[in-house]
Regions:
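Internal nucleotide-binding/catalytic subdomain
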Residues: 159-204
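ATP-dependent adenylation/nucleotidyltransferase module used to activate substrates
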Residues: 3-158, 168, 176-186
């Protein structure tokens, strides 16, 4: 099987919608895309509704980078699709992973929808992951990030071809989180030293 890395940022000059959380990973991903000539728009989706702090952080970062930001309250669908499943699994004695449910059903669905609305050819996130393209089968596959300690490919295995064929992971080749932070520092981003989130996104 002949496989090659796809989404070569040096060759692509298209509009992209990037999931912007307000954290350093997605902010750095936006910076990298802009440096490569992409026309970047940020997208912040509020999973619980009324998360003014999270929204404000995303707005500050978007302003610092110089990109527009789209906001959407997805709390109703998130509760129905993700939280209800989470509670049900716990009641059955299983340990659920809400990201595995959210990514294909909420996060990337919304990214694609808004990308189409603004005419963006691609979507992107700050995940540590890579994509491979199999020419023989004309199919895209998730690949582990170069940084094994930060790899997030296991949370994205349920994404379909409609998503993978338009998806860019700017941080996939990074070997350490320090590389990410250093880029943010050089650009004087306010979130350059922001700690990584260790909690489930809907549990404070």
């Amino acid at each position: 099987m002949q496989m090659r890395m796809t989404r070569n940022m040096e060759l692509q000059k298209n509009k992209v919608l990037l999931g912007l959380s307000g954290g350093v990973d997605s902010a750095t991903a936006a910076l990298l895309l802009k440096e490569k000539g992409y026309d970047v728009t940020g997208f912040y989706f509020d999973v619980m509704g009324g998360n003014e702090n999270g929204r404000a952080e995303a707005e500050v970062v978007a302003a610092q980078i110089g990109i527009p930001l789209i906001y959407e309250n997805v709390s109703e669908d998130f509760h129905r699709v993700v939280i209800e499943n989470f509670v049900s699994e716990y009641r059955c004695g299983r340990t659920p992973n809400p990201c595995i449910i959210c990514n294909p059903n909420i996060k990337f669905r919304r990214l694609l929808r808004h990308a189409d609305e603004i005419g963006a050819s691609y979507i992107a996130t700050g995940h540590y992951c890579r994509i491979l393209y199999d020419e023989a089968n004309d199919a895209y596959y998730i690949r582990r990030a170069a940084n094994d300690k930060k790899d997030q490919s296991y949370m994205l295995y349920r994404l379909g071809q409609d998503v993978l064929s338009r998806l860019i992971f700017p941080l996939g080749e990074f070997l350490s989180k320090e590389e990410t932070r250093e880029i943010a520092r050089k650009s004087h981003l306010s979130n350059a030293e922001k700690k990584d989130s260790q909690e489930i996104c809907f549990i404070d």
